[in-house]
Amino acid sequence: RVEDNSSLFGIRGTEDLGGGLKAFFQLESGFRLDSNNSSFATRNSGIGLQGGWGSVLMGRWDMPYKVAGYPADPYVLLTLAGYWSSVQDSGNFGRRPQNVVQYWTPNIGGFTARVAVTANEGKTATVDPKDFSAMIGWARGPIVVNVAYEKHEDQVGSTATAGAEEEGLMGVVSFKFGGTKISGIVERIEKTGRANRENFYVSLVQSIGKHDIIGTAGQTKGGQANGAAGSEPKADAVSIGYRYNFTKRTQMNVLYAKIKNNATSAQNFPLLPVPGVGNGSDPEGVSFGIVHVF
């Protein structure tokens, strides 16, 4: 099976309003060349104001929790092997909700933070679904450290459910020395009616001139329904990739990725699932792509 799931097109712009204030906008869409059935502004799209006090954004945008993991992910959603597309519970904690309001602080001594809340548009007499997400980060030279928290109220995944809660806590570290970058993510997810889920992910990028050799390994375990029979679900994910940087704006990527499930786990590639994957299955895939930024 051949799929095109990571082609993107976007535009952005700013206007100087004077007095240190700027307006900014972005419209970004994912599109599929193989099926031509894409919608408009499905990715980070919004409008906001920016000043010395920080930025305020309204629209559809990645939550701070999701953004916190970017420094450790050498693929950042573009392939089968990224954190959010291999071991993470992306159906719940890789969100890009619509009608979100976010505040981003300015950089203060290397520290930055983001906070986001969503509109509770699905509110009824019995449920009031809404999200809260926040991250704080510190970067100095080759070191990046991020911590993030997110909570979903009255929700199980994208389904409104009275009394249900989902919470996630994530820690991210990335360190670069010379042409080598080593990164890691540790995450714990708690959900009503389920055992805690723990995720681990490490990545290594070795740059030699225009060539990047990339390796990743991750594990997810737990998350089963309370009282479920059998052993604890566990899945291991690995990948090996190569990137050639033609210029600063154009690169080529190729990689191989595989997920190995134990007898009670059915982890799949969340962004591009392989059909028919059940407990104990081991999905795998090859990805090839070209990125050009203009």
Segments from the language model and where they lie:
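Outer membrane beta-barrel
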Residues: R1-N120, D128-K130, G137-V144
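Outer-membrane beta-barrel and related beta-rich outer-membrane complex signature
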Residues: N37, A68-V76, V127, T159, ...
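Transmembrane beta-barrel domains of outer membrane proteins
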Residues: G10-T14, G48-Q50, Q102-T105, A116, ...
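Extracellular loop and loop/strand-boundary signature of outer-membrane beta-barrel proteins
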Residues: Q88, N120-E121, G157-T159, E190, ...
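C-terminal beta-signal and adjacent terminal beta-strands/loops
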Residues: F246-M252, Y256-N268
